[in-house]
Every structure is written in structure tokens, then in C-alpha cells.
Amino acid sequence: MSMVRDLFLFCCFTGLAFIDLYNLKEENIKEFFDEGEWIVIHRQKTGTEANIKLLDYPKQIMEKYRGLCEDGRVFPVPNYQSCMDSLKRLGKKCGITKPLSWHMSRHSFATSVCLSNGVPIETVSSMLGHKDIKTTQVYAKITKEKLSKDVEKLSQQINNIEEFTFGNVCNDNTNTINGRV
């Protein structure tokens, strides 16, 4: 059950669908120009390329299981039904009332990990391997916290622009045009 937990969390931080996790091979882990490790795959569902930079937490999970597969796969992923059964037990053990699904990890990556932290939707779309940004927009339900943070940032930016400060508007003594009021 702990392996299924780790795999689910790996997907929460990479956005991989179950089948793409199952098929993930060492050859899909690449080092790019930024010297970071990236997952580069063609999604089974769409054939679209997905490029996902590995954050520290999924790297740690990957290292925990590396070398356990002899067929080049990164993880020894059990079959889908076995994973779903374990996921249901994990949810109950954690007091989660809504039944967990593997797709929830992908959704969590898109919303909680990326969009809520300011990652542009175009970038999220690329990482998820979507063909059309409209597909990604399904995930883009904004949280109240994100909305509040964004409006506060906007307010600070506007307040930093001297022309728009309330004081300059009210203290302007140029209320005359050609000497007339």
C-alpha cells in the first residue's frame, strides 16, 4: 500500500496519467539545458509530447524505486485494479470521504501544484500533454485563495505606479486650463 501511495503522490507532482506512469521508462528521464531532470513522454492517450521538470519530491520517490525493474521501467507499478483497491483503502485510512481516483492526482497537479502557484495555463497544458488548451481550461477552476492573492498583487502593482496613486490625483493643482477654472 505504501508503494501505491508513493506512486499516487508522484503523479500529484508530475501530472502523469496512470498508464503513462505504468509505461514510464528510464529513457524518458532526460537532462536538459538547465541541468534538471525532465520526464519526456508521448502520452498514450493522445500521442502528444509532455515535458515535465522533476521537482525534488518526485525525484526522491523515483530514487526509492529505481533499479527494481529489469525491463527499463522506472517503477514496478502493479496492475490498475490492484492500485485502485489500495487507493480506496488509503483514502479510508486517511479519512477522505470522497473515493480517490487516479485521475485526481493529475487534477491535483494541474490545480494545486501548478495553477494555484502561478504557473501559466499554457505551461500546464504543455506539461499535461494536452493537444488543445481548452482541455486544460477544465482544470483552471480558480481557488478563492489564488483569486485573493492575484488581486492583492494587482493592487500592489497599481499602487506602485505613481500616475495612479490617489495622492497625486487629489493634490494636483492644475485645475485650470489656460488660466481659467
Region roles according to the model:
Residues 43-47, 80, 128-153:
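Catalytic-site neighborhood detector that most strongly recognizes the C-terminal catalytic loop/helix
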